[in-house]
Amino acid sequence: MSSKVITIIIFIVIYLVFLLITFILAYLYQIKNRDFIHFNNKYLEDWNKYKLENKDSNLSEIEFEYELPENEIGLFQKELLISKTNEKTPDYKDYFDDDYLVLKKSLSLYQTTSYHFEPTKLYLTNLHLVLDDNDQFYKYKIDEIKSCSICVIKDKNLLEKGCVIKIKDQSLTILGDVFLLVLAIKKLKKEF
């Protein structure tokens, strides 16, 4: 055999070995994340069902323990576990079209974020999102919210239901029953 044929055979064998290694690693990754994928699919099915059931419903006004200005209406009030992370949010065009914005981060090979969840009271009005963590208030305008996505949060190998709200230079990771909160924010942003 000529040296060209031997070289081609060697390259084909090396290519097939790399291909086999890639398939094995992909299979092991799929096995490792099987629970997450199943949990995430169930959670997104519940979210889609909730969206369809409440698509045409109006946001109902609720009373807060604090007095609101005349032009503000209380829409959501709940104590949730919230972790605040300072990270610059890049500007995309269609944040709200993508309910799966955080999925890539959750399926990462490495734990990239360490969450520090604290019980925090969250208030949503037609103009502001307010966080009360007993030490101080954080007040964000609804227009400052860049995205609000339902997601499964993977924290120290525990799978939790929640959402991620991205604001200018901050990311809020929220655990708990947040379907009404996310739906209200999307309706206020006129994205739903």
Sequence positions of predicted segments:
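Anionic N-terminal interaction surfaces
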Residues: 29-121
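Conserved beta-hairpin
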Residues: 111-137
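Acidic, Ser/Thr- and proline-rich intrinsically disordered linker/docking segments
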Residues: 137-192
